[in-house]
Amino acid sequence: MPKNTICLWYEHDAEEAARFYAETFPQSSLGAVFRAPADYPDGKAGDALTVEFTVAGIPCIGLNGGPQFKHSEAFSFQIATDDQEETDRYWNAIVGNGGQESQCGWCKDKWGISWQITPRVLTDALAKGGDAAKRAFEAMMPMKKIDVAAIEAAVRG
C-alpha cells in the first residue's frame, strides 16, 4: 500500500464504483477487496468493507461505511483530456451511468463523486493568461460538458 492514499466513503457500493472507474479510465485498476470479519453497524460479515483501487494512477481506498457521510464538490477528480472524443467518452460514461451534469466541465457519478473533465486546450489557455485566457474562460462559463471546438475558437479570437 502506498504511503498516501485517498480514502473515499461509500454507502455500500465501493466495489461497484471501483470496477466502473477501472473500466472507464486509463491507468485505473481494481485491487484487493477486504471483507468484514464480523457484522458491523452498516453491514454483515463477508460484505466488502474496503476496496483498493487506482483511478488514473491515483491510489484510492473505498470504504463502505454506511449513509452517514455524503460526497461534495469540495473533492473532485480532474481528468485532463486531449480532444473532444476523449472528453465525450469520459463525460458520457459518468453521466450515462446514473451520474449528473453540472457546470464548467464538472459532473457527478452515481455515487456522488465529482469529476472535472477538462480538455487541455482549456487549461493551457488559462495558464498562458491574457486575452486568450479571458475568451476561453468566458466561453467555458455557460457550458456543461466542455466543447473543445468552441474553446479553440475562443482562444483564436
Question: What do these predicted ranges mean?
Answer:
Residues 1-2, 69-71:
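Short, flexible turn/loop "capping" segments at secondary-structure junctions
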Residues 5-7, 50, 76-78:
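Short aromatic/hydrophobic contact patches that present stacked aromatics
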Residues 8-57:
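Core segments of cupin and vicinal oxygen chelate
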Residues 10, 14, 24, 55-59, ...:
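Vicinal oxygen chelate
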Residues 40, 73, 156-157:
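A charge-rich, low-complexity, intrinsically flexible signal that marks solvent-exposed coils, linkers
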Residues 64-67:
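Short beta-strand/turn micro-motifs at beta-sheet edges
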Residues 131-157:
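C-terminal cap/linker of serine protease catalytic domains
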